[in-house]
């Protein structure tokens, strides 16, 4: 497996535990179906079997933790914090102009949260991140806001 950071390994373990509903260390097709359903997908039995077959290297019909880690490692690849930060910024910067406006922030927050934020709360979030005072958040300001102090 590729070298994974401790954070990535913890994330993989959390994901595995979410799939492994009964906690027996294996993901069955039934457990996979439950998780897929919670994600709004309804795969057929054949699709579920195919998903498991792609990952199930020992051929026992279930996905063990080691197989899950191997699959996730292939998908994750090496982490590039700069690239991840740029991708996160792009999620907010809907029109791609390099600035996050209050309208863009409101749109993203509406998608990610059930709580409806007031215009005042959105404006406050922008103000907190907006170092140069132009009423928008540029990439450098976004990085400062997202980086733990």
Swiss-Prot record:
GO cellular component terms listed in the entry, alphabetical order: myosin II complex
Binding site for Ca(2+) 2: 56, 58, 60, 62, 67
UniProt entry keywords in alphabetical sequence: Acetylation, Calcium, Metal-binding, Repeat
Positions contributing to Ca(2+) 1 binding: 20, 22, 24, 26, 31
Molecular function per GO: calcium ion binding
SMART domains: EFh
CDD domains xrefs: EFh
Ligand binding (Ca(2+) 4): 130, 132, 134, 136, 141
InterPro entries: CALM/Myosin/TropC-like, EF-hand-dom_pair, EF_Hand_1_Ca_BS, EF_hand_dom
Annotated ranges, domain EF-hand: 7-42, 43-78, 80-115, 117-149
Residues where Ca(2+) 3 binds: 93, 95, 97, 104
Residues carrying N-acetylalanine: 1
Similarity comment: family membership: Belongs to the calmodulin family.
Known role: Not known. This protein has four functional calcium-binding sites.
Name of this protein: Squidulin
Taxonomic placement: Eukaryota, Metazoa, Spiralia, Lophotrochozoa, Mollusca
């Amino acid at each position: 497996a590729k070298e994974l950071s401790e954070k990535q390994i913890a994330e993989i373990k959390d994901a595995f535990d979410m799939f492994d509903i009964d906690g027996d260390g294996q993901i069955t097709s039934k457990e996979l179906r439950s998780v897929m359903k919670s994600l709004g997908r309804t795969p057929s039995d054949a699709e579920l079997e195919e998903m498991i077959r792609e990952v199930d290297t020992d051929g026992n019909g279930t996905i063990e933790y080691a197989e899950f880690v191997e699959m996730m490692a292939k998908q994750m690849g090496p982490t590039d914090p700069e690239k991840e930060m740029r991708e996160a910024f792009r999620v907010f910067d809907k029109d791609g102009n390099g600035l996050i406006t209050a309208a863009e922030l409101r749109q993203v927050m509406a998608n990610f949260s059930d709580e409806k934020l007031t215009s005042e709360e959105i404006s406050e979030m922008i103000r907190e991140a907006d170092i140069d005072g132009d009423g928008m958040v540029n990439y450098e300001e976004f990085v400062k806001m997202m980086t733990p102090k």
